[in-house]
Regions:
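Select transmembrane alpha-helical segments in multipass membrane proteins
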Residues: 31-42, 112-125, 172-176, 228-240
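Structural signature of transmembrane alpha-helix termini at the membrane-water interface
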Residues: 84-91, 132-135, 139-149, 182-189, ...
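Helix-loop-helix junctions that connect adjacent transmembrane segments
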Residues: 14, 20, 24-30, 69-73, ...
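Hydrophobic/aromatic residues within transmembrane alpha-helices of membrane transport systems
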Residues: 34, 48, 93, 112, ...
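Lipid-exposed faces of alpha-helical membrane segments in multi-pass integral membrane proteins
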Residues: 43, 47, 74, 78-82, ...
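Extracellular loop-to-transmembrane helix junctions
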Residues: 53-161
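Membrane-interface "cap" regions at the ends of multi-pass membrane proteins
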Residues: 1-56, 60-69, 73, 84, ...
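Membrane-water interface regions at transmembrane-helix termini and the short interhelical loops
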Residues: 29, 92-95, 118, 122, ...
Length: 257
C-alpha cells in the first residue's frame, strides 16, 4: 500500500496529456500575444525594483557582507551568466510545453504531482510576497513625490494598523494593487499594452541616468577595483542576482503566444 501511495504522489502527466488538456475548448486561452508583447513582458518583469534599489547596497556593503566596489561589474557578469543558464532552461521547457503554469507544469511533467504541488504553492507565495513588497515600496516613493509637491497624506492612510503610531491601511499600496488587478482582469492584451508603456518609461529613466552620469565618470574611483577581493564580488553577485529575476514570467504566457 505504501508503494501505491508513493506512486500516486510522484505520478507524472505526459506532455501529450498536458497539451491536450490545455487545448480543451472549455478553458483554452486565446493566442493574442506577439513577440513584442512577450519581450515587453520580460523586460518589464526583469527591470524592477532590484536594478534601482539594490545596487548601492551591493557596492558599499553593510555590517553583514562586504561590498564589491567597482568590481560590481564582475558581480553583474556572474549573476547574468547564472540567470542566462536558468533562462535557457525555461526557454527549452516553454517550447516543449507551451501552456500556462510555468514551473508547476514543468514539475508535473518531470518530477511528479506532489513536487509540482509544492512548486505551485511556492510560486503563489513568491508572487504574493513580491506583490506586497513592491506595492509598499511604490507607496513610499509615491508619498515622497507628493511631499515634494507640497501634499502630505494623513498618517493613518499610509501606515498599516499595529504600528507604533497606529494606522488604518496603506491605501496607496492597496490602490496600485487594485488598479493592476483590474488591468489583468480586463485581458492579457491590455496588460501587455500597459506593460509596454511602463517598460518604455523604465528604459527612459535608465537612459537618463546613463546620460547624466557618463560625463561625471572619474577613472580614479575605479582603484582599487575590488577593495574586498572576490569575497565582496561574490557577496554582491548574490544581491544583484535579484536584478535579473523575472524572466520566468515569459514562460507563463507561452499558451497565449
Amino acid at each position: 500500500m505504501g508503494g501505491s501511495v508513493i506512486r500516486r504522489l510522484f505520478r507524472t502527466k505526459s506532455i501529450e496529456q498536458i497539451l491536450a488538456d490545455a487545448d480543451h475548448p472549455d478553458h483554452r486561452l486565446k493566442k493574442t500575444l506577439t513577440a513584442w508583447d512577450l519581450t515587453a513582458l520580460g523586460i518589464g518583469a526583469i527591470i524592477g525594483t532590484g536594478i534601482f534599489v539594490l545596487i548601492g547596497t551591493a557596492i558599499v556593503g553593510d555590517a553583514h557582507r562586504p561590498g564589491a566596489g567597482p568590481g560590481i561589474i564582475l558581480s553583474f557578469v556572474l549573476s547574468g551568466l547564472t540567470c542566462a543558464f536558468a533562462a535557457l532552461c525555461y526557454a527549452e521547457f516553454s517550447t516543449m510545453i507551451p501552456v500556462a503554469g510555468s514551473a508547476y507544469t514543468y514539475s508535473y511533467a518531470t518530477l511528479g504531482e506532489f513536487l509540482a504541488w509544492i512548486t505551485g504553492w511556492n510560486l503563489i507565495l513568491e508572487y504574493g510576497v513580491a506583490c506586497v513588497a513592491v506595492a509598499i515600496g511604490w507607496s513610499g516613493y509615491f508619498n515622497n513625490l507628493l511631499r515634494l509637491a507640497g501634499i502630505e497624506l494623513p498618517h493613518w492612510a499610509t501606515h498599516p494598523p499595529g504600528g507604533p503610531d497606529g494606522g488604518v491601511a496603506n491605501f496607496p499600496a492597496a490602490i496600485i494593487v487594485l488598479l493592476v488587478t483590474i488591468i489583468l482582469v480586463i485581458g492579457i492584451k491590455e496588460s501587455a499594452r500597459a506593460t509596454g508603456i511602463i517598460v518604455c518609461l523604465k528604459l527612459v529613466v535608465i537612459l537618463f541616468f546613463i546620460a547624466v552620469g557618463t560625463p561625471a565618470v572619474n577613472p580614479d574611483n575605479w582603484t582599487p577595483f575590488m577593495p574586498q577581493g572576490f569575497a565582496g564580488v561574490g557577496a554582491a553577485a548574490a544581491i544583484v542576482f535579484f536584478a535579473y529575476i523575472g524572466f520566468d514570467a515569459i514562460s507563463t504566457t507561452a499558451e497565449e503566444a
